[in-house]
Amino acid sequence: MKKIAIMQPTYLPWLGYFALMESVDIFVFLDSVQFSKRSWQQRNMIKTHSGPIWLTIPVMTKGKRDQLIRGVNIDYSRKFPKNHIDILVQSYQKSPFFNEYADEIIKIMEQKKTSLSSLTIDLILLFRNLLNINTPISYSTELSPNGVKDEMLASLCYQLDANEYISPIGAKEYLDDSKFFRELNIGIKYFEYNHPKYNQINGEFAPYMSIVDLLFNAGKDSLSILRQGLKSE
């Protein structure tokens, strides 16, 4: 049984993103679909001294409609990435493992990559390495799948010889009746994640923060903590 997950690249993803990645035999970045403004594709949450806040990457959207994720460019005229780096430093510099990981994260953010997906994917790959996750990676842009939505997902599974698609539970409503998966004899299982608790600075525990929150607070224990939330059906 070859398990596959197919996910859009997101900015500083939460724990569940990496738990899903570690649960499969191959992980595909779905970077060939339409960009959704102010979605996880360009933002996520971290925990500051005053509580959780959004960090959102500014992007070029004026006069550009129906952009694919891979075609969206970052708007560097709006103080990014300095504003995000400053907030990360102010929020986490006193965390136990900040000094262990911060330089590598900041180095990627300061590279001023042109496209949104180049930055978000490079950060995700860094976090994958820091967590010691070894799942092979592929990209939908390199595979040219057929169709849209469930047809595209089934096509990606087929091209990569996967026979079990592990999907976020939120897609259950439209995947349950997918003829494309049935026709290709590809099974579907739904991934659920019970968010674990861990020692966290800046007050009362707040779940669903970016993976940086776990790394800065838990260090080498991050992967074992990540696994505590695993639950699939």
Identify the meaning behind each predicted range.
Residues M1-E233:
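Residues lining hydrophobic/aromatic ligand-binding pockets adjacent to catalytic sites
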